[in-house]
Amino acid sequence: MPRRKVVAKREILPDPKFGSERLAKFMNHLMVSGKKSVAERIVYGALDKVAERSKDEPLEIFDKALETIQPMVEVKSRRVGGATYQVPVEVRPSRRQALAMRWLVDAARSRGEKTMVQRLAGEMLDAAEGKGAAVKKREDVHRMADANKAFSHYRF
């Protein structure tokens, strides 16, 4: 057991336009080198593009995309004897959200569109519909956990 004090979680202020803490957290994931204004411009631009392309509310589509991407189970390596097993474990809610945001940003960065605004908007729309690279990543993680179900008795 560590002897240090438990560090208090920092409070994340909601974003100025929509008042959503989840969106503010996503901006922090997207931000590079502390450039928050650039991250805000990209996210708000992407949400505007989503609003143009879809009849639904852009924040609803963002939330739906994150819900679709969130993994329920993942695999963790556990060493037993001389062998390393990939043990499926349930993902706690805070990590679920963090992974979904990370995967959405990574998938958007790897897309082929010209600007990051277009890439992010496209990936959000795809994820909300249940397709795209971020959803594929989730399916791969779930498939890996399913394949290693036999080792689930090696709990953490």
Curated annotation (Swiss-Prot):
<dbReference type="InterPro" id="IPR000235">
    <property type="entry name" value="Ribosomal_uS7"/>
</dbReference>
<keyword id="KW-0687">Ribonucleoprotein</keyword>
<dbReference type="InterPro" id="IPR036823">
    <property type="entry name" value="Ribosomal_uS7_dom_sf"/>
</dbReference>
<dbReference type="GO" id="GO:0019843">
    <property type="term" value="F:rRNA binding"/>
</dbReference>
<protein>
    <recommendedName>
        <fullName>Small ribosomal subunit protein uS7</fullName>
    </recommendedName>
</protein>
<comment type="subunit">
    <text>Part of the 30S ribosomal subunit. Contacts proteins S9 and S11.</text>
</comment>
<dbReference type="GO" id="GO:0006412">
    <property type="term" value="P:translation"/>
</dbReference>
<dbReference type="GO" id="GO:0015935">
    <property type="term" value="C:small ribosomal subunit"/>
</dbReference>
<keyword id="KW-0699">rRNA-binding</keyword>
<dbReference type="GO" id="GO:0000049">
    <property type="term" value="F:tRNA binding"/>
</dbReference>
<keyword id="KW-0689">Ribosomal protein</keyword>
<dbReference type="Pfam" id="PF00177">
    <property type="entry name" value="Ribosomal_S7"/>
</dbReference>
<keyword id="KW-0694">RNA-binding</keyword>
<keyword id="KW-0820">tRNA-binding</keyword>
<dbReference type="InterPro" id="IPR005717">
    <property type="entry name" value="Ribosomal_uS7_bac/org-type"/>
</dbReference>
<dbReference type="InterPro" id="IPR023798">
    <property type="entry name" value="Ribosomal_uS7_dom"/>
</dbReference>
<comment type="similarity">
    <text>Belongs to the universal ribosomal protein uS7 family.</text>
</comment>
<comment type="function">
    <text>One of the primary rRNA binding proteins, it binds directly to 16S rRNA where it nucleates assembly of the head domain of the 30S subunit. Is located at the subunit interface close to the decoding center, probably blocks exit of the E-site tRNA.</text>
</comment>
<dbReference type="GO" id="GO:0003735">
    <property type="term" value="F:structural constituent of ribosome"/>
</dbReference>
